Amino acid sequence: MKSFAACAAAVITLIASLSAQQPRILTVDHRVTVQSTVPALAGKAVELYVRERYSAAMKVTAIAPERVVLFVHGAGTPAEVAFDVPYTDYSWMAYLANAGFDVFAMDTTGYGRSVRPAEMGEPCNLSPEQQKQFIPTMIPAPCAAKYPGQLTNLGSDWNDINAVVDHIRALRKVEKVSLIAWSLGGPRAGGYAAQHPDKVHKLVLFAPAYNRAAAAAPPPLPNPGVVFNTQSRAEFDANWDRQLGCPNQFDPAVREVVWREMIASDPAGAKWGSGVRRAPSTTTWGWNAAMIGGTKIPTLIIAGAQDRQVAPERVKAAFDDLGSPDKVLIDLGCSSHNAMWENNHTLMFAASLEWLTKGTVNGSRSGVVQMGYPKS
């Protein structure tokens, strides 16, 4: 495997600050090489995309160890879209960068600008229902899958995360990084942290897809199931709309920017039908009551009250089972599974900053904190 210096080619773009009071925020694109454990790519050296953002006023070569953060995405949206929306103050990455953090976000295999297995270029590997939207433009009729199961798995995701964490640790000469994760990023980041507590400082988990009864060991891989999936603009909108419970919960202009960035992250998918986002199906296991119960890392967990993808009760279960004495659960009102793109995003961002810098939320190191609900 090539050295980290050779593996991570960086292209630097200067980004204008949103206000005259804020310093310039730099963006650096890295390519990190990993020996893949994805069954379809097993043993191959492949590249993962990592985005970095930091203030031009900061000397990153002398960064404080507790100020290095890595974002980990969920099941569908790549990290650079989820956490770096280029619209007013909606970039979580830029928010933390402005606060003096060196901020990274990674795409695991099959997502965004990271390596995509060839199996994701075959419409026959979609579910029969999703195949319908590509008949007859891409396939003449329904067809059988050409790969035997789900494309990626938690083990391969943990392997990807470890490669990026080690790259960051070597790059910034720190022992630990903090992880911020969304949705399926919960098992990815939380499971990784449980297995590598020596490399993780703190955790922030938004809507973690927790299953306290998850199997402790993986099934034979690849696990039978749909290989990968797509999401169209209409599906993206409908999924968000079903989670709206408050007036003016989000700015419609944000949705336009998010979808634009989503399609830009998948140039091949942009040419499928009216344009889709592609993502691998992922086999999960391991991040269960036993694993999370043994986790002692300080952890902030956030649940959106209107979330219809990872129910608040499921998030509360993760909080209850977590073994760390330093743990806070935020019950975030008027917020969906997409809260970082909604009007309460500023509350989330500020809470994450307080947690990362002080280990508290509103001054508390443990317990449940409500915020974001309409004032009576």
What are these regions (language model features)?
Residues 143, 213-302, 376:
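Alpha/beta-hydrolase
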Residues 335-347:
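Catalytic histidine-centered segment of alpha/beta-hydrolase-like enzymes
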Residues 132-148, 152, 158-176:
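Conserved acidic catalytic loop of the alpha/beta-hydrolase fold
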Residues 57-105, 115-120:
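Short, surface-exposed "cap/lid" segments of acyl-processing enzymes
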Residues 21-64:
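N-terminal cap/lid segment of alpha/beta-hydrolase-fold proteins
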Residues 308-314:
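Conserved alpha/beta-hydrolase "acid-adjacent" motif
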Residues 322-338:
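Catalytic histidine neighborhood in serine/cysteine hydrolases
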Residues 171-180, 184-213:
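Conserved hydrolase catalytic core segment
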